[in-house]
Structure formats: structure tokens, C-alpha cells
């Protein structure tokens, strides 16, 4: 074997990572350069990156008409005016302004209802694409590249979490709607902190892990202070200010990375994982007494509850152990070694066990939350009333009668499949129990192999329509959400390839074989992949290639599809998944960016049209409709999870995501703009609504930093009500200011 081949084999993953990073940088450089090329002004010494409005022609004192002037045009001439002056408002495939104003007056309300309904559907779709498809591929890619969990959390998963907000922001900037872009970032953070977190608090009081809470809320507070000092103070951003925002996020990344070294994770991959009300993540494991003490054991376990099981690896349990170096913990090196050896001897699916786990988690999955809630209540009705704060000391026995004999069909978001007939041991839970005693009790019982509970091969219909599984047994609102999600899931299943690899904790000590990414699991459907060979190329050329002869482009796409179908049909087995299957996640990564960008462009086009129709400021639309819409799936998913009895999970990703979105969305955009324009400052038009939102968001964060520690890190309905009041008052103030502005 030559030295070159040995080198490529040894460093292939590093090379792939470098290629992926270069491609990603080039892609965004191209997108950002196009965006700022259209908004940069060479007639002024400063770069008016986000400024937009009516100007006067000094030569003849005539007002330059814009689309917003359509309100001054008679209804009979509004259609012609829209065709002449509103073409720039259409950022997507459809011109919604023309669609509305070229409709007769008697039908404009139904047309407006169609536009609003389409907007709601797009918001749901962009949330599903990010959480259930795009983020899943990112997790698989990180597994293939052997990246540590802490690095994955602040890179790949951060990208997946913030993809709708970041891509929507760039889509708004590209069409000169900077006010909408900044408004979306601040409004989304305000909505998530006040409404999403407040909803979780209202549903079920619980105790929150102090370390993650203080870290994330403190850094988000610092982010808002930077925005107030740099952006809202004088309406401009210099290069050094942009660099400070970027470096501040890097500081957050480093802090997350190094603060994660206080714990050790053990990952157990079990084909017969039994989600008995989520054993590892269950609030039963997080019972606290009323004392002031908040042990590291409780903290670490509760912090692990921040992971949504459907977004972790399929049928993978993570158990978080206490730091060996912590003198307050009695977890000896002997016990550590014993557990380590046990996993290696009994778990044939994982040869990498120990890892440090920290950092931001994947955004909550809307589909997973819906399915998880219905499955959890169906299988364990007796556990619905468990309160995270009021678990009494004593024994908890799981009897076989609590478990129904059912096996879930394969679900794209990775819902774990329950099994039946497993009698869990009688486990004693108390506030004084140590983690190692609990884990030792669990490990004392034998595990089950794949042969004990073979899973049937998934049918094509179950793969194409997973939200309709157990449809008759769901509540009315779950049925409504499932029906609304059917078109989106069907489209993405056909045109966005995804592979959910078992997410094993990464430790550089152990070697990982990529073939372990597809252990004999029934996640392979050749029929589905054959259909994807048709729809994936079609979606790629439709949404990514502009210009040229469309007939030739689609003909080339058809030829490529035929070649892929032929190769897949003759060189793959009907039952056994091919070894290259995990690598389709790279294709899904590219298609995910294309899909989310396309949907974001369409959303921006609709919002701009609504601004013209109702004569609303773009910043108000960004702060309210745009922000709430992009966070809609998060709100629904977190409410479902909290109502299922796991509010810790629902609260997990509330504070980390906005930090990334604001710092990267504003910092990198303004920095690149300044560099491209000879170091000039970026001037940003700041309406009063942006300042009002920023200060109310800061008030919410200060309330959390004061109230939660004083309440011994318990969040309750009083806190949720206060957050709701702040959001209602802040939003109402913005609307009143906007209405009074034109009077």
C-alpha cells in the first residue's frame, strides 16, 4: 500500500471535515456577498446595510414611488401599480402583493386568508425541516467525523438549532429588509424567553439545574447588553464591535467546552430500550428535598434531562456520572472501572463508552414531541401525574402491566421503540440516593438482545406518513397537528434524504468503525431510497439552479435519477442496508440548507406583502409575526414535552439558541459588510420598536436571574405568569408606538 493511500486512509475523516468546512464557508461567502452587494451604497461614506425607505430626487423634487405608496392609489389602479412598483417585494416563487391587489375587492379577504394560512403552514414546515431532518443529518455527520460531543453541541447542533433564524435573517437582508432581520432576531429571543419558557413554567413547576441555567442566561444577558451598547446606542457597527460580538460567542463556546469537563457520560445502546416514562431522563430521578442543598448528583442528572430523547440517538440511553475528582462524590475509580468493563462486555453495539457531554442541545422536534406524548400516555397512564417536585422517598416498581405489547414503526425523527414484557427491578428512589447505586442496580439485571425482540421491516406507508401512526388514539389537538404536518413530512421524506445514526458518545481513546453506524436495524427501505432518487435531484435543480434552459436542466436531472435508480436496484440488497447509507446525510445536509433557505425566502416574501397590505413597519413584522412563526414549532414541542411530565427537557434549549442567532446573525453580517466596503461602519436604521423589545427582553432575563436563585432554582407558575405579562406589555407597547407614529 502506497504512502499516499495510507495517509488518505488515516486522515480521511479530517480531510472530509476540512472539505465540508471549506464548502460551507464558500457557500455562505457567496450568499452574504450577494446580499450585501444589493444593499451597499457607494454614494455615502458609510455602509447603509439595513437602511431602507423613501428618498427624494433632488434634481426634480419628485418623490420616488415605492410599493408602500400603493395605499394612496385608487383601488381600480392598484393592480397596475403593484405590477409596476412591487416586483421587488417578491423574494420567493410567488408575488403575493400582485396576487392580492389584482383580485377583485369582494374576493380579497379569502385571498388574504389563503396567504395567512400558507404562511402558518410554511412556519410549521421550516420548523419540521430543521428539527426532524436537518439536525438529524448533522448529528450523523458529526458521528461520522468522530467529533466530541462538546464540539458537536456548539457547532453542528448550534447550526441546526439556529438554521431557521439565521437563514431567515439572511433572506431578509438579501432583499433590503434589514429592519425585519434584526427584528426577527430580537423578537425570536423575546418570544422564546418569555412565551416558550413561560409556558413551560405554567404547565408544571420543576427544579432547574443551576449550572446550565446561570451559564446560558448570563451569556444571553451579556449578548443583549452588547446589542444595546453597540447597535441601539448609535445605530452603527464598526469592525471592532462586530469582532467583539463574534469573539463573545467564541468565548461562550470555550466556556461550554471546558465547563463540560466536570462530568462523564456513559452511553448504552440497547435495541430493546424501554422508555418507561424515560427512565434515565425521568423527573423521578430528579427528586429533590426541600433543603437548601443542591448536590452535584442532582445537578448532573437534571442537566442530562435537558436532552429530548427523540433527538438523541435512536434507542440510545445516556447515563451521566459524577466527576471522579469531586471530593463530595463517592464514585470511586474502582466503580468507574467496573462500569466501564461492564459496558464493554455486555454492549456489542458500542465500543466507545465514556465521554464528556455538554453544550447546546438539538432543537426540540415537533413530530417527536407529539408522538412521544401520545405513546408515553398510552403505555404508562399511571405515571402521568408524577410531579418532579413531589416524588416521595420509597420504591418505584415497574410492572409488566404498565407496558403494552406494541412495537413502533420506524419514525424519521428517531422515536425510540418500546418493547413489552420487561420487568424492571424494584428501585428505591430518594433524595439521598447516589447515582452509582441506582446505576449498579440497573446493571445488575441482564440486557436483551436483538433476537429476543425482532422488529418488523418498516412499510413504505409508515415511512411516508409517520405522523398518522396510532392516529385514532390521539387527542384532537394532536390529530390536528399530525394532519398539518403530513404534507411537510411527506415532501421532506421524499426530497430530503436523512439517516439517523446511533449517536454514541465520542471518546478519542476508542476506535470507531463506521460500519457500526448501521447495525442490523430495520431503518433501510430500498423502495423509499428509489423514490428519493427521483425527487431529490428534482428538488435540487428546482431550488438551487437559476437561469439556463430549464428543459435541459430537468432532462439532465432525469438521466441522473435513472442512473441512481439502476445502481441502487442492482447493487443493493432488499433487506440489508448498504455500508454507504450513513453518508447520504451529507446530501441531506446540502438539501436541508436549500430547503430551509427556500422556505425562508417565501416567508420573507409573504411578510413583506403583509406589510404592504396593512401598511405595517417591517421591524414590527419581524418582532412579532416573523419571530413567533419561526419559534412556533419550538413552542408546540416544548408544551407537549412539559405536559408529558418532563419540563426539564422542554426548558433545555431555551436560552442557548438566541445567543448564537443574535451574535452570529448581527456580528458576522456587519463584519463582512464592513470588510467588503473598505472598513466603513455599518449603519443600521433603528426604529423605536427594536429598542423597546431589547429592553423588555433584558427585563425578562434579569427577572430570571433574580427570581430563580431566590426561589432555590425552582421555577413555578408565578414566574411563568410574570414572563407572559412582560411579553404582552412589551408587544403592546410596540404596536401602540407603531400606530401613533403615523398620526
UniProtKB/Swiss-Prot annotation:
Disulphide linkage map: none
Gene Ontology BP terms: intracellular calcium ion homeostasis; monoatomic cation transmembrane transport; monoatomic cation transport
Keywords: Endoplasmic reticulum, Ion transport, Membrane, Transmembrane, Transmembrane helix, Transport
Pfam family, one: Na_Ca_ex
Record-level GO cellular component terms: endoplasmic reticulum; endoplasmic reticulum membrane; membrane
Coiled-coil stretches noted in the UniProt entry, renumbered to this chain: none
Bilayer topology annotation: Multi-pass membrane protein
Location within or outside the cell: Endoplasmic reticulum membrane
UniProt function note: Putative cation exchanger.
Family: Belongs to the Ca(2+):cation antiporter (CaCA) (TC 2.A.19) family.
Protein name, UniProt field: Putative cation exchanger C3A12.06c
Amino acid at each position: 500500500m502506497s504512502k499516499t493511500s495510507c495517509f488518505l486512509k488515516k486522515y480521511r475523516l479530517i480531510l472530509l471535515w476540512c472539505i465540508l468546512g471549506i464548502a460551507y464557508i464558500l457557500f455562505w461567502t457567496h450568499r452574504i456577498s450577494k446580499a450585501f452587494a444589493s444593499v451597499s451604497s457607494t454614494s455615502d461614506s458609510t455602509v447603509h446595510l439595513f437602511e431602507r425607505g423613501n428618498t427624494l430626487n433632488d434634481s426634480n423634487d419628485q418623490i420616488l414611488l415605492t410599493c408602500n405608496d400603493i395605499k394612496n392609489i385608487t383601488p381600480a389602479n392598484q393592480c397596475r401599480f403593484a405590477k409596476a412598483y412591487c416586483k421587488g417585494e417578491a423574494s420567493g416563487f410567488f408575488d403575493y402583493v400582485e396576487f392580492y391587489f389584482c383580485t377583485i375587492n369582494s374576493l380579497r379577504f379569502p385571498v388574504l386568508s389563503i396567504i395567512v394560512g400558507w404562511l402558518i403552514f410554511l412556519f410549521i414546515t421550516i420548523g419540521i425541516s430543521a428539527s426532524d431532518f436537518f439536525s438529524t443529518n448533522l448529528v450523523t455527520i458529526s458521528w461520522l467525523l468522530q467529533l466530541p460531543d462538546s464540539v458537536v453541541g456548539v457547532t453542528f447542533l448550534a447550526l441546526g438549532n439556529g438554521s431557521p433564524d439565521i437563514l431567515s435573517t439572511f433572506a431578509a437582508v438579501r432583499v433590503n429588509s434589514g429592519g425585519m432581520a434584526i427584528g426577527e432576531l430580537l423578537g425570536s429571543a423575546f418570544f422564546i424567553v418569555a412565551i416558550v419558557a413561560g409556558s413551560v413554567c405554567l404547565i408544571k413547576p420543576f427544579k432547574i439545574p443551576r449550572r446550565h441555567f446561570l451559564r446560558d442566561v448570563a451569556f444571553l444577558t451579556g449578548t443583549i447588553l452588547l446589542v444595546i451598547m453597540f447597535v441601539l446606542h448609535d445605530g452603527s457597527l464598526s469592525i471592532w464591535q462586530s469582532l467583539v460580538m463574534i469573539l463573545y460567542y467564541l468565548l461562550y463556546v470555550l466556556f461550554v467546552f471546558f465547563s463540560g469537563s466536570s462530568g462523564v457520560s456513559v452511553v448504552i445502546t440497547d435495541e430493546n430500550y424501554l422508555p418507561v416514562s424515560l427512565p434515565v431522563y425521568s423527573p423521578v430521578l430528579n427528586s429533590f428535598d426541600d433543603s437548601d442543598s443542591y448536590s452535584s448528583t442532582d445537578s448532573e442528572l437534571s442537566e442530562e434531562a435537558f436532552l429530548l430523547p427523540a433527538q438523541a440517538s435512536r434507542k440510545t440511553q445516556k447515563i451521566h456520572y459524577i466527576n471522579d475528582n469531586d471530593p463530595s462524590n463517592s464514585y470511586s475509580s474502582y466503580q468507574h472501572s467496573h462500569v466501564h468493563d461492564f459496558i464493554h462486555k455486555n454492549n456489542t453495539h458500542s465500543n466507545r463508552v465514556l465521554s464528556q457531554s455538554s453544550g447546546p442541545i438539538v432543537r426540540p422536534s415537533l413530530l417527536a414531541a407529539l408522538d412521544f406524548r401520545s405513546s408515553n400516555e398510552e403505555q404508562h397512564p399511571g405515571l402521568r401525574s408524577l410531579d418532579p417536585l413531589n416524588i416521595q422517598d420509597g420504591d418505584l416498581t415497574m410492572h409488566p402491566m404498565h407496558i403494552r405489547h406494541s412495537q413502533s414503526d420506524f419514525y424519521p425523527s428517531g422515536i425510540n421503540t418500546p418493547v413489552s414484557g420487561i420487568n424492571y427491578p424494584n428501585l428505591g428512589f430518594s433524595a439521598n440516593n447516589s447515582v452509582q447505586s441506582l446505576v449498579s442496580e440497573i446493571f445488575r439485571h441482564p440486557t436483551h438482545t436483538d433476537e429476543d425482540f425482532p422488529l418488523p421491516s418498516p412499510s413504505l406507508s409508515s415511512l411516508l406518513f409517520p405522523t398518522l401512526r396510532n392516529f385514532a388514539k390521539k387527542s384532537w389537538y394532536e390529530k390536528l397537528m399530525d394532519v398539518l404536518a403530513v404534507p411537510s413530512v411527506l415532501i421532506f421524506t421524499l426530497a430530503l434524504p436523512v439517516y439517523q445514526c446511533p449517536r454514541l458518545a465520542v471518546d478519542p481513546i476508542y476506535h470507531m468503525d463506521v460500519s457500526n453506524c448501521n447495525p442490523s436495524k430495520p431503518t433501510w427501505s430500498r423502495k423509499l431510497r428509489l423514490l428519493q432518487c427521483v425527487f431529490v435531484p428534482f428538488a435540487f435543480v428546482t431550488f438551487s439552479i437559476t437561469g439556463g434552459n430549464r428543459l435541459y436542466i430537468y432532462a439532465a436531472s432525469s438521466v441522473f435519477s435513472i442512473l441512481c435508480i439502476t445502481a441502487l436496484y442492482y447493487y443493493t440488497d432488499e433487506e440489508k442496508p448498504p455500508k454507504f447509507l450513513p453518508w447520504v446525510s451529507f446530501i441531506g445536509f446540502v438539501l436541508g440548507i436549500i430547503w430551509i433557505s427556500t422556505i425562508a425566502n417565501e416567508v420573507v416574501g409573504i411578510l413583506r406583502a403583509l406589510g404592504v397590505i396593512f401598511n405595517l413597519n417591517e421591524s414590527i413584522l419581524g418582532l412579532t409575526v416573523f419571530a413567533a412563526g419561526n419559534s412556533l414549532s419550538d413552542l408546540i414541542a416544548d408544551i407537549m414535552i412539559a405536559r408529558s411530565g418532563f419540563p426539564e427537557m422542554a426548558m433545555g434549549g431555551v436560552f442557548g439558541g438566541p445567543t448564537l442567532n443574535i451574535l452570529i446573525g448581527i456580528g458576522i453580517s456587519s463584519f463582512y459588510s464592513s470588510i467588503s466596503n473598505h472598513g466603513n461602519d455599518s449603519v443600521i436604521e433603528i426604529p423605536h420598536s427594536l429598542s423597546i423589545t431589547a429592553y423588555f427582553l433584558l427585563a425578562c432575563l434579569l427577572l430570571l436571574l433574580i427570581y430563580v436563585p431566590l426561589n432555590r432554582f425552582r421555577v413555578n407558575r408565578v414566574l411563568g405568569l410574570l414572563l407572559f405579562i412582560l411579553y404582552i406589555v412589551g408587544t403592546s407597547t410596540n404596536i401602540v408606538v407603531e400606530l401613533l407614529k403615523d398620526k
